[in-house]
Amino acid sequence: QTPKYLNIFANPTEKMNQLKSIIENELDTYCLKFQSEQCSYIQKFPTTRNLFGWTVSLKQQGHQKAHIHPSGWLSGVIYLKTVPSLGKDEGAIEFSLNGKNYSDLKSPKVLYQPSQGDIVFFPSSLHHRTVPFTTDTDRVIVSFDLIPEAEKH
């Protein structure tokens, strides 16, 4: 796992530049898709593409507890390697309103079972976690945050 203070886009290689370009193109598509929405999340969407990225590799029994990304506006995940779910949501990403200090068992949860190559965007303020998995394989992702100009690292 890349330490969070090391931004993979800070001194990019040619491959990282290609990856960043893919993300930026997907962000453009995302913005166009929702541009007519009246919610403040879209209306105040950052116009500058300040991306902060890192990698995560989880092994068997790997998971991430529910968390948010407080300095980001939008967070994203690119799935480089996924794990088979075995019908139990293993390796899925779960979105909810539940976090360390915000637990409500009745709050809605949304599970997404990723496939290799998927890119997933979500508000950085939305709690998310990785469902633990039992298969003897790795789950490898590139995570990133779109940082508003005032919050740039």
Where are these regions (language model features)?
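A short glycine-rich, His/Asp/Glu-containing loop-to-beta-strand
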Residues: 47-57
